[in-house]
């Protein structure tokens, strides 16, 4: 019998547009979209909720979108910025688990089955993650919590935007029975229409059918429909992300300008960094961590980092870096301080010992 899992699906709300509104708050209440121009025969990558009131949606041709919403503000895709923010989101995920399966820049599965934070509650963990994303990055995320991947994904869409929906193990059967087949990942308009022609509207309808009926009509995907309709999804969260660094950062309660205040914050973060290194890299001694980094975020939300190789991993070397990077402040107050180390490459014998 498979171990009962706790899976969270995080889906950022209109991610690209949300990042653009964060960068330029004047856009917040205006219909905006990110995508290609009419001249490029482009399509919308995403749009904010004011734009969606006009019927706009992702993948809509830009020309059509402008006809529906003549006042639409169209912004070009800034993929460098979105990747940067996506990385920051993933760093929040890593506070709870390393078992992360990114689906895109704004969407990921997390397996928190063995997580000890929040008393092991996947619901509380999901809420903490959403709160951290909002407080630290000024973005909203929706979350779905369930024991199966496909249900976690469906759940994250239930209370969008900025919501959470939980399906406990005991609720799976009832939830699946009434679930419209159109909600199943991969069931588009064409497949949905074919299912309707067969008299199948919900997963409960499929439960009355023999598997061979769906196999004959839809091939291998028919098996997937049948399994999901019976609450079966044995796929595990697959993490292909190789961790390259360990870090800790904190948004301050009040902005600071004095270097001595920065050192106090560094002193507070340093032992937390040590704990995270021990947890993330238990087989690597501290003396091998020599590439150290300090990160600052200013009151204007600009971020700067300074990384240097040191003779050894110790508190004093981080303070040296902090004093150097503090000179980049240029009169701006500091709202966040962070520390990080680059994980050294393992020696051949250490790599072999893993097998």
Curated annotation (Swiss-Prot):
Binding note for cofactor: Binds 2 magnesium ions per subunit.
GO molecular function annotation: damaged DNA binding; DNA-directed DNA polymerase activity; magnesium ion binding
Keyword DNA-binding appears in the UniProt entry: yes
N-terminal signal peptide: none
GO cellular component assignments: cytosol
The protein's enzyme class: transferase
GO biological process: DNA-templated DNA replication; error-prone translesion synthesis; SOS response
Positions annotated as active site in the UniProt record: 107
Protein name in the entry: DNA polymerase IV
Keyword DNA repair part of the UniProt annotation: yes
Coiled-coil region(s): none
Site (Substrate discrimination): 16
Catalysis performed (reactions): DNA(n) + a 2'-deoxyribonucleoside 5'-triphosphate = DNA(n+1) + diphosphate
Location relative to the cell: Cytoplasm
SUPFAM superfamilies: DNA/RNA polymerases (SSF56672), Lesion bypass DNA polymerase (Y-family), little finger domain (SSF100879)
UniProt similarity note: Belongs to the DNA polymerase type-Y family.
Domain named UmuC: residues: 7-188
Lineage start: Bacteria, Pseudomonadati, Pseudomonadota, Gammaproteobacteria, Pasteurellales
Organism (species): Mannheimia succiniciproducens (strain KCTC 0769BP / MBEL55E)
């Amino acid at each position: 019998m498979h171990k009962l899992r706790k899976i969270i699906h995080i889906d950022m709300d209109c991610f690209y547009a949300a990042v653009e509104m964060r960068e330029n708050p004047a856009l917040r209440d205006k219909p905006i979209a990110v995508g290609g121009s009419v001249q490029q025969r482009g399509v919308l990558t995403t749009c904010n909720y004011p734009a969606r009131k006009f019927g706009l949606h992702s993948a809509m041709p830009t020309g059509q979108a402008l006809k529906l919403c003549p006042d639409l503000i169209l912004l070009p895709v800034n993929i460098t910025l979105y990747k940067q923010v996506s990385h920051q989101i993933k760093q929040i995920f890593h506070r709870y688990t390393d078992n992360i399966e990114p689906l895109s820049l704004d969407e990921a599965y997390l397996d928190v089955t063995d997580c000890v934070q929040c008393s092991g509650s996947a619901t509380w963990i999901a809420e903490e993650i959403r709160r951290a994303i909002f407080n630290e990055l000024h973005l909203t995320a929706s979350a779905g919590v369930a024991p199966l991947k496909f249900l976690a994904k469906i759940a994250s869409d239930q209370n969008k935007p900025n919501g959470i929906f939980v399906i406990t193990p005991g609720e799976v059967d009832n939830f699946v029975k009434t679930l419209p087949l159109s909600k199943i990942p991969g069931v588009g308009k064409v497949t949905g229409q074919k299912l309707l022609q067969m008299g199948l509207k919900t997963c409960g309808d499929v439960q009355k059918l023999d598997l061979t009926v769906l196999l004959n009509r839809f091939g291998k995907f028919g098996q997937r429909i049948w399994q999901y309709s019976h609450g079966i999804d044995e796929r595990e969260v697959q993490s292909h992300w190789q961790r390259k660094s360990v870090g800790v950062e904190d948004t301050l309660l009040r902005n600071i300008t004095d270097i001595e205040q920065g050192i106090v914050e560094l002193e507070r973060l340093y032992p937390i960094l040590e704990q995270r290194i021990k947890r993330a890299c238990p087989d690597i001694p501290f003396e091998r961590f020599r590439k150290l980094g300090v990160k600052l975020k200013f009151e204007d939300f600009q971020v700067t980092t300074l990384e240097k190789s040191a003779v050894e991993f110790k508190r004093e070397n981080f303070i040296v870096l902090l004093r150097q990077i503090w000179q980049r402040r240029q009169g701006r107050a500091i709202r966040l301080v962070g520390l990080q180390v680059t994980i050294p490459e393992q020696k051949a014998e250490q790599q072999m010992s893993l097998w």
